[in-house]
Amino acid sequence: GERPQGCEYCWKIEDMNTHAVSDRVYKSRIYPIEALDEAFRTPNSADVNLRTLEISFDRTCQFACSYCNPAFSSTWARDIRTNGPYTGLVSDGRNHFTHPHDHSQLYKFGETNPYVEAFFQWWESDLHRTLQELRITGGEPLMSGYTWQLIDWFKQNQGRSNTRLAINSNLGYDDARLQEFIEAIRPLPHVEVYTSCEATWAQAEYIRDGLDYHQWYDNVQQLIESGAIKALHVMCTINALCLSSLNKFLDHLVALKALYGRNAVSFTLNILRFPSFQSPLVLPEDIRALYRGRLQAWYAQNETNEFLHEHELRHVQRLIDYLAHVQSPHSEAFDMPKLRNDFRQFYTQYDQRRGKDFRHTFPQLTDWY
C-alpha cells in the first residue's frame, strides 16, 4: 500500500515499534466493527448519512494559547493587530503568526451568515434525526451565540433528537457563567465536554495564555459533580514546554478519577506537530531524556492503577517511545537549528506581548534557552 502524506502522523507512531497504536485506531474505535465493515464495502459514490460531524461556528475565544494562532482565536488576532507580526520565524511558512487571518471569520454573530444558515437548515430538516454525534469546536464554543442557539434547540425540542452533543471548552469562566452553562445543558439527553490542559499552575498558564489553573481545575470538578454531563475528556497537547510538569498534571487527573470514578474523566496525549518549533523534539537530547525518565517512572508507578484505562496508559507509553525514537516533527519540518532559533525568537516576543517571563516559569530550560 501507499503512505499518503496526510497520514504521516500515524505512521510515525506505528513505525516506532510493533506495539505502537496510532490515532487511526483510536479514532475508529467509536464505531462498531459492523459499521467499519459497511464503510469499507460501500462505494464512494453512495449517498450516506453522516454519523459524526465536527463544526466550528466562529473563532471567538478569550484565550491565546502559545500553540494556537489567529485563525482559531480572536484574542490571538487582537495580538497581531495591536503588536504587529511575529518576526524572524523562518519555519512559519504558512504565516500563522504574521497577520490576523480575518478570512477565518467573515461574519459576526447576528449578521447574515450563509454557512451557519445552511447548517441550521440541514440540522432542522434531517440531520438531527440521523447524526449520532455533533461536536462543536472553535474558538471557544461557549462564547459563540450559535452554540447557545443550538443548546436552546435541544431544550425546545426534547425527544426529537438523540444526537450526542460534544462541546469543546477551555472552561475559563467564573462560577456564574459556568452554572449558566450547567443549567442550560441539564435537560439535554447526552452532553460530553472536551477541555484542554497539559501542565500545572504557572506553566499551564504560560502555555495557555488566559488560563487560571485553579479556576480550570475547580470548574472541571463542578462539571462532574453537577451530573449534567455524561463524561469529561481532557485533551493534552504535548509540546516542548509541558513536559516538565506533565507527570504532575497526570497525577491531578488520576486524583479526579479516584474521587469521581474511572469513567468520570479521561485523557489523551496528542503530540503537537505544528507549529513545529514548539514540538517536544526541539528540546536537546539530555532534557528529553530527563523528561522521558520522569514519564517512565510515572508509568511504572501507575501501570496497575485501577482508575486508568488501557488507552490512557498506551498514550503515555507512546509518548515515551516518541521522545526516544522520533527525530523530526514531520517530513516538511525545517532542520533542528532553525526550529530552535524560531523557538527562542517566538517566546522572546511572546513574553514581551503577553507580560510573561519564560526564564522564571521554566527554570530548567534557562541554560539551553
Question: Could you describe each region identified by the protein language model?
Answer:
Residues 1-109, 127-128, 315-369:
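N-terminal pre-core extensions flanking Radical SAM catalytic domains
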Residues 6, 119-122, 150, 216-219, ...:
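Alpha-helical packing segments of well-folded alpha/beta enzyme cores
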Residues 50-60, 71-115, 129-147, 157-177, ...:
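Core AdoMet radical
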Residues 58, 77-80, 185-188, 196-369:
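Radical SAM enzyme [4Fe-4S]-AdoMet core and its adjacent flexible, acidic
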Residues 116-119, 124-125, 283-285:
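General structural signal for secondary-structure boundaries
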Residues 121-127, 152-158, 182-186:
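Leucine-rich repeat
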Residues 148-152, 176-184, 245-247:
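Distinct, well-ordered alpha-helical segments
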